[in-house]
Amino acid sequence: MNQLDALRQWTTVVADTGDFKQLAISRPQDATTNPSLILKAVQKPEYRPLLDEAVSKHAGKPLDEVIDRLLVRFGTEILSIIPGRVSTEVDARLSFDTAATVARGERIVALYKAEGIDTEKRLLIKVASTWEGIEAARTLEQKGIRTNLTLLFSFAQAVACGAAGVQLISPFVGRIYDWYKKSAGAQWNEAASAGANDPGVKSVRQIFEYYKQHGIKTEVMGASFRNVGQIRALAGCDLLTISPELLAELAASNEPLAHALDAKAATGGDVAKVSYDEAGFRFALNEDAMATEKLAEGIRAFAADAVKLEKLMQESGK
């Protein structure tokens, strides 16, 4: 049995890509997209017609709506291939606006419903894990709209998401690893910081065990992997969203895979339950330099790619 099939025994495998033509190869249950992945996809000749079609079909509509329609087009193509759910992201420029995030999430849901998609079972609305984003997700969940809280780098963010009753969180393993590696500079010891000792892996394990111990139903989906060692160290996590390149690497390996995270074992933990009001959340996040920097950086990057996507659309419409 290869490692990808072994992983499927304990973990729902999710493909992290906008390149839906690769999905038939890796056979994931779910798929995730983000503005950067869609931007990357539409720059390939085989996907450029989707962008041109969105622009020509919806000429005269606001660019933000045309982008949402493009995201939904990619999402519906993905859903025609996979059996499970797709995650579609709200514009990162709305990360600090609760009401606008709710409105955009509702619009994306309406667009999927117009395509005949059962959104309650097959769609997750991705929202940045800011205080405003988490509160927007709380409202969306109360309306029956399932959410995926992304750009999650800290325990405080995970606690707030669990309290809000969100469907799923996406802690970013690789970006946490990147920060600690850069921060350590010449002192970084790769061997000593690999596998279970990887700072990103440790963060996900802490969140996973806390959720299971306290009966929090929110699903944990490790994301943003830099190497297969990080994935192997999280075998047993509820879900893992993995790039096509790393999925292929797992499929090519027949080395034994250990069951690293055990939900049943985690229920016996003794970590006290934590709660945050807005002030407490903001202070806890501020105390975590890595999470503060990576959250801000991630929002900036996704927002910049949304702007690039708008520019491509403007050029296409000329």
Curated annotation (Swiss-Prot):
Q: What is its EC number?
A: 2.2.1.2
Q: Name one GO cellular component term.
A: cytoplasm
Q: What is its main location?
A: cytoplasm
Keywords for this protein: Cytoplasm, Pentose shunt, Schiff base, Transferase
InterPro entries attached here?
A: Aldolase_TIM (IPR013785), TAL/FSA (IPR001585), Transaldolase_1 (IPR004730), Transaldolase_AS (IPR018225)
User: Which residues form each disulfide bond in the chain?
Assistant: none
Query: Per the record's keyword annotation, is Cytoplasm included, yes or no?
Result: yes
Which is an annotated GO molecular function term of this record? transaldolase activity
Its biological function?
A: Transaldolase is important for the balance of metabolites in the pentose-phosphate pathway.
**The name this protein goes by in its record:** Transaldolase
Q: Which gene encodes it?
A: tal
